């Protein structure tokens, strides 16, 4: 049997060679293929399912097809590139920190598969005199006066003199004030970390500072 895991928990069994779905069961073992929650489905079948289950708020695709197992033609494509499933804040933190690894970057963004994104007319990041930045990804528009290491900074982040950012994800528009320290944390966009404040988590229990209420 060829097995694929759905969302890290469900296994889809395909009878070898005939592309017929034989069932879904829970549990995944090391060495089995994980379903990436991506699939191509017949437009007609998808529209039929929308009509059949219109009154339902949410329904898993495999639950919707459960009554048709045995007749649906299912085929697979093996993806061998970099994958980072994100289901928890720790997953999010770890997958972002992995972007500091050049091997992961090269695997995720190969030259032959470019990523096109929206352009922003912001100036390059500027490391001011007296600042120190090591092993970090710093986006355009940032101004660094303090110390940044092993971190990821979104656009237009300001790290003031005497502030320290270590092993952290700082999102767009944040200001880390003088003397503040942020470590093993995720700071959502447009936050201001007050002078002298310490935000510190651990790699296993990451601290999250949510977006300020408007």
Tell what function each PLM region has.
Residues 1-53:
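Conserved core of the sugar-phosphate nucleotidyltransferase
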Residues 53-214:
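Left-handed beta-helix
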């Amino acid at each position: 049997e060829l097995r694929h895991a759905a969302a890290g928990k469900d296994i889809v069994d395909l009878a070898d060679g005939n592309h017929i779905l034989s069932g879904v069961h829970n549990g995944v073992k090391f060495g089995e293929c994980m379903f990436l929650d991506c699939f191509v489905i017949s437009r007609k079948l998808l529209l039929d399912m929308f009509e059949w289950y219109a009154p339902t708020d949410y329904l898993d695709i495999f639950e919707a097809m459960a009554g048709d197992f045995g007749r649906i033609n299912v085929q697979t494509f093996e993806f061998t590139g970099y994958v980072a499933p994100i289901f928890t804040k720790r997953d999010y933190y770890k997958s972002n920190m992995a972007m500091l690894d050049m091997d992961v970057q090269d695997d995720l963004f190969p030259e032959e598969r470019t990523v096109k994104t929206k352009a922003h007319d912001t100036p390059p990041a500027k490391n001011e005199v007296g600042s120190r930045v090591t092993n970090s990804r710093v986006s355009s528009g940032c101004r660094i006066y303090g110390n940044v290491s092993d971190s990821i900074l979104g656009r237009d982040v300001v790290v003031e003199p005497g502030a320290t950012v270590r092993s952290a994800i700082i999102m767009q528009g944040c200001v880390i004030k003088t003397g503040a320290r942020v470590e093993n944390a995720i700071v959502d966009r447009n936050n201001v970390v007050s002078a002298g404040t310490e935000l510190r988590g651990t790699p296993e229990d990451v601290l999250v500072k949510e977006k300020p209420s408007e």
